[in-house]
């Protein structure tokens, strides 16, 4: 699926995201300001997990792009499942990239759940962190994107910094409702809950993406981003399982990414890996 659709959605005459749609989660307390967790999650993400809370609505005024960008400027590094799952969880490292302000440059590290709904349409929900040329003034931001709103949603309450490692969880408990959660301040923070025409299972992606503004072509640099502890939630229930070689997986052609100067290294197929600038030849 072309990730450029998301950037096009940002600029289709829409302002920054309206509050994320909540379904059966209004009873969650508001999340308090805190810091990135240094300990891994102790329970599955759920509105019934201990001290679960709901994030504030995405903050207005972070800015928006003003014209569509060409998909030719994209580089994708990662993998996707070829079977459907009920969710995905994992940890993403935050880095400071060379994204230029007031451009359509962006770097994003994210998980996605998606399904083809026919007639060329795809429904999806994604969550991760991003550094963009149009929002955040050079900061890295937690974000979500879904095909109900077709908008990037930035969560300014979470003060990220390079070196942070953040846990994210995307899953469904049924009824076509898919949720994105962030493990922050040692509790699960609900980012968004969306009723999507995906069903009880979806295809899963894990990617680091780089987009270079085609109107202002330049070479971007990307310090190595680590993705690890990636686990899949089985459709129909059961314990999470690590995304390993026994999971039917599709990876893209790495040649175009190397041409752009970006390399992917699998530490363990497919739950631990790095992506970033290719090593300089000696």
What are these regions (language model features)?
Residues 23-282:
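Exposed, interaction-prone regions of secreted/extracellular proteins
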Residues 1-24:
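Secretory targeting and sorting signals
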